[in-house]
Amino acid sequence: MYYKTGDVCRKIINVDGFDFQLRVKKRVYSVEMVVLDHEGNSIDGLLVSDENDLYTALDILKQSVYEWIENNTDEQDKLMNLVMKW
């Protein structure tokens, strides 16, 4: 196999100008997906065992990220992101 059990991959994802980290860990019969905030705190995580689970998990994680943005940012944060897109 390409990935060994226990291998962890990380990727920066950007949602509405805010950076988050996606951490994916291979387990014996599943893959663990965890989204972390800019300080490394877990926002949400799920276990995925097949491709159908993946699409559901991505929707759930995306909703968790939007909730985090709503609860942890203010209008000035959002305005700064709009300015930085320029």
Language model features with spans:
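Mixed-charge, Lys/Arg-enriched low-complexity segments
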Residues: 2-3, 38-86
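Amphipathic, interaction-prone secondary-structure segments
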Residues: 4-36
